[in-house]
């Protein structure tokens, strides 16, 4: 062991790492284990700095190259000696052959020691040289120990015995080296004799060079020496190149680690853990958290916190004073109604007249004040000298009288101004009432659409502050007519990126510019009327955590669905059902499959069913409320004790399902008249998305997903109209049983996130909502009786801070003429092919064309969009014409007065065609057909004769027909584009021809018989490629 420790010390000394030698001894590191060191073992020995790690790495690489793998069971010393013999033999070949083997070995060993001491780590060292160094070190230590003290005889004897053992080992090594050297010389001699014998047959005279054999041998020796030198140089270069590559790799690794640590520290100190990223929801102080609060704080990296937070749209946050979010809003006000424009003009005119009247009144007041001041100055400057006392009294009385008159006039003016202000206020009130009446008269909801049992709407939130900082893209396109497209980024097998489009259609789609009042009008407000007709209504929000569910339900400054519904319920109650019904509320949550009362200090509840199989919550407290403000105060108090916490995805995540029930009860009998339930579902999240290892948060997430899965199973059972619906699988489904059974109506608001990283969650939410929508459509198809269209009372106006941004043209009933004409015009332009196989994205037309087709258009635009194919039809068929047209047709000569100038219209620009989208759809549909062909081939081959050949051939013909249809469709579009310039030239030439025909030429006059023959020869135009397909 002493020998191995000395050897290890010498190895570390070569790399200037001898200071770490005690750590190697503590860990009992031997020479063999040292050679098998890895990067992970460096820290166990205390080597942590980058430079020391590099030195140790290069030392291990050099030692591994010098000591090849052990084949026999002999000791490592013998193997190292063999390597040394090979090195020594190579060196001896380069040196003179007359020297002895011992001298050569000694010289080589000395040279190796000197080179190692000088070059450090670049030049490889042999284990024999290390042994010689060990011997020298041992002799020096023995001499120093003998000279220092004469009492340590035992230590000397031990050191002498070690020295003898080492000397014997050296002698054995030298004998082995001599034997190997003798064998090598014999081999060289045999090769030389063979070489010389082969050279004897060489014809020297035939060669052009006048060289002797001796010169040839000398050249050969020189050539062999040069080759050896080149090989050695290449080996050294390769070795240095490998070392440089290893150094660069290590530097890159450590640089990356240092950069990650620096970024982590910068993010940690930059981020304010007490503030939400949006900067619009809360402004929490930087003090320590309150120990009495129910918020659960989970430690984690700063990058993982506040990933997705609840949001506030821009149009609401600006009014509240939170202006940090700067998101562009798409204000589409191209097609405002004429009534709104007229009202705006009238208001502007009234404001202008009022400003002029105010200016005139101010000028009159200033003039009166100037007159009063002048009179006072005259009275003050009046000279009373030379007058009696009676005269002075008389003048003073007159001055006082005039002052009283002036004061009376000023008081009358003030009274008139006050009366004018009151009149203006009353006029404004009347105008507001008229506007409200007009809005109420314009308010219209088609109950065939809004009266469905299950309606599904989607709301998209804007990108938050953190997502904008990460430069994430918005992958969701909200189209008119209740459509939605998700551009999901994907990669193919060849690592080429592409975007897969998914199209969804719902009952209502709201983009990021929509506020809570607009969402309320189209989701929850139609249900308010049903609870007054002894019905039950449910509105629940579903979506990923941080997608805006709680903001939709609660809102800010009384603009959430809770507050807006409470306003309309109490307004309807006071106007129609006063002293008949009263309002009672209950507020509870479902946390971990258990019920807790939020209005009674989280008292535990139980869910049961009565004899009529109706759900009853035992122990639930109800509070009688008389105003919307009192209702909102109860909700705020309940939310304070609701279970929330911070997760890896959202810092303020709702960890429970909160349920608010607004019940209408009869005052006399105390029986239930109607019930409205608002359900704020907890955020759905996957276990792989949670970066914290808290057991409680993972358990909460599992309970949330379990309840949502049970809800999905119930919806599926109702959709399939199965006999048994598993409402008892979860507490959530038991509570929601009334929402899906009986006289009930339900609205689901699916909240989605638009960022690219949440594409999978967004698609899962949309598919979940689409499944619920299918349930509603299946039930509506089963009940084919149409609902009578009736109008419900208009809602209350929006809150003050939402009036500026409120613009909802859907409330005004739209005429059916414009929609039908646009549809026919566009269908004539873009014929639809009967698709044999729908693509995955479910898009039959390009997105741009769908947007154009869904925008309402004026009749002029509709005429401009008519295809050019319809123009010759109007000219050729017998269409009723005006007298001017008949005159032009028969070419009747006209007087100069009758000849009117023909107004030439500029040629219409042809509509732009998006060939890329057409081609992409063509390729997608073609690929689907190819997939079906491959499937049919596999089925026919695997059937082994069970499928008849005729069916297989029929399938082939169908595939070919569908391919031909796709090809013809694309060719038709290309031909239509190529014919557009020709049609434009014809349109430009028509007015010129009409001018030429208007001149009287007797040769052009036709008889009636000729005209009849010409009409009989006229034929209708041939049908185009698309006429049969439309």
UniProtKB/Swiss-Prot annotation:
It comes from the Eukaryota. Keywords: ATP-binding, Cytoplasm, Cytoskeleton, Microtubule, Motor protein, Nucleotide-binding, Transport. Microtubule-associated force-producing protein that plays a role in organelle transport. Its motor activity is directed toward the microtubule's plus end. Residues 81-117, 125-164, 181-197, 225-238, 826-839, 849-906, 981-1009 have a biased composition (Low complexity). Residues 3-66 form the SAM domain. It is found in: Cytoplasm, Cytoskeleton. One of its GO terms (cellular component) is centrosome. Residues 239-290 have a biased composition (Acidic residues). Residues 68-80 have a biased composition (Polar residues). Residues 66-164, 178-308, 826-915, 981-1030 are annotated as: Disordered. Induction: During the developmental stage. It holds the Pfam family SAM_1. Belongs to the TRAFAC class myosin-kinesin ATPase superfamily. Kinesin family. Residues 453-775 form the Kinesin motor domain. ATP binds at residues 543-550. GO terms for molecular function: ATP binding; microtubule binding; microtubule motor activity. This is Kinesin-related protein 6. GO terms for biological process: microtubule depolymerization; microtubule-based movement; mitotic spindle organization.
């Amino acid at each position: 062991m002493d020998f191995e420790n000395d050897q290890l010390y010498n190895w570390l000394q070569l790399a200037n790492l001898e200071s770490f030698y005690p750590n190697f001894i503590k860990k009992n590191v031997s020479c063999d284990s040292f050679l098998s060191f890895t990067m992970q073992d460096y820290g166990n020995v205390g080597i942590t700095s980058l430079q020391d790690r590099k030195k140790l790495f290069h030392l291990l690489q050099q030692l591994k190259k010098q000591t090849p793998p052990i084949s026999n069971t002999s000791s490592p010393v013998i193997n190292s000696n063999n390597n040394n013999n090979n090195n020594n033999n190579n060196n001896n070949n380069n040196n003179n052959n007359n020297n002895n083997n011992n001298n050569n070995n000694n010289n080589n060993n000395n040279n190796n020691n000197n080179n190692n001491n000088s070059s450090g780590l670049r030049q490889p060292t042999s284990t024999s040289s290390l042994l010689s160094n060990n011997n020298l070190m041992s002799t020096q230590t023995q001499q120093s120990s003998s000279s220092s003290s004469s009492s340590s005889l035992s230590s000397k004897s031990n050191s002498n015995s070690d020295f003898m053992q080492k000397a014997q080992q050296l002698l054995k090594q030298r004998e082995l080296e001599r034997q190997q050297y003798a064998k090598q010389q014999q081999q060289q001699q045999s090769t030389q004799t063979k070489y010389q014998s082969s050279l004897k047959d060489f014809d020297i005279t035939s060669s052009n060079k006048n060289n002797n054999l001796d010169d040839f041998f000398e050249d050969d020796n020189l050539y062999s020496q040069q080759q050896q030198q080149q090989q050695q140089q290449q080996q050294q270069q390769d070795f240095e190149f490998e070392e440089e590559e290893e150094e660069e790799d290590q530097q890159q690794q450590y640089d990356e680690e240092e950069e990650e640590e620096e970024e982590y520290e910068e993010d940690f100190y930059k981020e304010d853990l007490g503030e939400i990223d949006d900067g619009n929801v809360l402004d929490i102080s930087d003090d320590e958290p309150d120990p009495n609060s129910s918020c659960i704080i989970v430690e984690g990296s700063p990058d993982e916190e506040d990933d997705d937070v609840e949001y506030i749209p821009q149009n609401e946050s600006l009014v509240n004073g939170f202006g940090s979010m700067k998101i562009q809003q798409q204000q589409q006000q191209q097609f405002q109604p004429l009534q709104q424009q007229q009202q705006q003009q009238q208001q502007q005119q009234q404001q202008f007249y009022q400003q002029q009247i105010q200016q005139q009144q101010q000028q009159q007041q200033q003039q009166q004040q100037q007159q009063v001041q002048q009179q006072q100055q005259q009275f003050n400057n009046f000279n009373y000298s030379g007058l009696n006392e009676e005269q002075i009294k008389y003048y003073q009385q007159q001055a006082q009288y005039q002052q009283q008159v002036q004061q009376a006039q000023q008081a009358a003016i003030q009274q008139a101004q006050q009366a004018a202000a009151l009149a203006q206020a009353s006029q404004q009130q009347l105008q507001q009432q008229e506007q409200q009446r007009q809005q109420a008269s314009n308010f219209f909801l088609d109950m065939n659409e809004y009266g469905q049992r299950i309606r599904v709407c989607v709301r998209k939130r804007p990108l938050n502050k953190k997502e904008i900082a990460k430069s994430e893209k918005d992958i969701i396109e909200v189209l008119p007519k209740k459509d939605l497209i998700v551009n999901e980024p994907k990669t193919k097998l060849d690592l080429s990126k592409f975007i897969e489009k998914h199209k969804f259609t719902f009952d209502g789609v709201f983009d990021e510019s929509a506020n809570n009042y607009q969402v309320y009008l189209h989701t929850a407000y139609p249900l308010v009327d049903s609870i007054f007709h002894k019905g039950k209504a449910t509105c629940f929000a579903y979506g990923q955590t941080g997608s805006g569910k709680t903001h939709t339900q609660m809102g800010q400054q009384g603009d959430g669905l809770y507050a807006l519904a409470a306003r309309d319920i109490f307004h309807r109650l006071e106007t129609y059902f006063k002293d008949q019904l009263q309002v009672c509320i209950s507020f509870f949550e479902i946390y971990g499959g258990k019920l807790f009362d939020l209005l009674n200090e989280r008292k535990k509840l139980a869910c049961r069913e009565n004899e009529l199989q109706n759900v009853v919550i035992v122990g639930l407290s109800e509070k009688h409320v008389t105003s919307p403000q009192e209702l909102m105060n109860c909700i705020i108090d309940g939310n304070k004790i609701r279970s929330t916490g911070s997760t890896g995805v959202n810092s303020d995540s709702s960890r429970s399902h909160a349920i608010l029930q607004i019940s209408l009860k009869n005052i006399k009998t105390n029986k239930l008249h109607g019930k409205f339930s608002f359900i704020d579902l907890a955020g759905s999240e996957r276990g792989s998305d949670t970066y914290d290892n808290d057991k409680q948060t993972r358990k909460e997430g599992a309970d949330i997903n379990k309840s949502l899965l049970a809800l999905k199973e119930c919806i599926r059972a109702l959709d399939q109209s199965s006999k048994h619906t598993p409402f008892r699988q979860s507490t959530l489904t038991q509570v929601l049983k009334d929402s899906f059974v009986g006289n009930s109506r339900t609205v689901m608001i699916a909240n989605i996130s638009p960022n690219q990283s949440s594409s999978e969650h967004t698609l899962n939410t949309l598919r979940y909502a689409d499944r619920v929508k299918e349930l509603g459509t299946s039930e509506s198809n089963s009940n084919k009786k149409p609902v009578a269209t009736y109008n419900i009372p208009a809602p209350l106006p929006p809150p003050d801070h939402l009036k500026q941004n409120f613009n909802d043209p859907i409330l005004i009933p739209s005429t059916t003429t414009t929609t039908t004409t646009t549809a026919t015009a566009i269908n004539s332009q873009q014929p639809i092919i009967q698709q044999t196989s729908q693509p995955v994205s479910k898009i039959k037309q390009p997105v741009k064309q769908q947007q154009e087709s869904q925008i309402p258009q004026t009749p002029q635009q509709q005429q401009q969009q008519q295809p050019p194919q319809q123009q010759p039809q109007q000219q050729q068929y017998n269409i009723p014409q005006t007298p001017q047209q008949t005159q032009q047709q028969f070419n009747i000569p006209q007087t100069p007065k009758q000849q009117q100038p023909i107004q030439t219209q500029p040629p219409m620009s042809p509509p732009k065609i998006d060939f890329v989208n057409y081609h992409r759809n063509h390729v997608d549909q073609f690929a689907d057909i190819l997939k079906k062909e491959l499937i049919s081939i596999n089925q026919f081959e695997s059937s082994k004769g069970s499928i008849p050949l005729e069916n297989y051939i029929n399938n082939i013909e169908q595939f070919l027909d569908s391919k031909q249809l796709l090809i013809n469709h694309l060719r038709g579009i290309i031909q239509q584009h190529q014919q557009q310039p020709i049609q434009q030239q014809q349109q430009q030439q028509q007015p010129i021809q009409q001018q030429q025909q208007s001149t009287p030429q007797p040769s052009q006059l036709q008889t009636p018989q000729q005209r009849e023959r010409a009409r009989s020869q006229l034929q209708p135009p041939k049908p185009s490629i698309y006429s049969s397909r439309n």
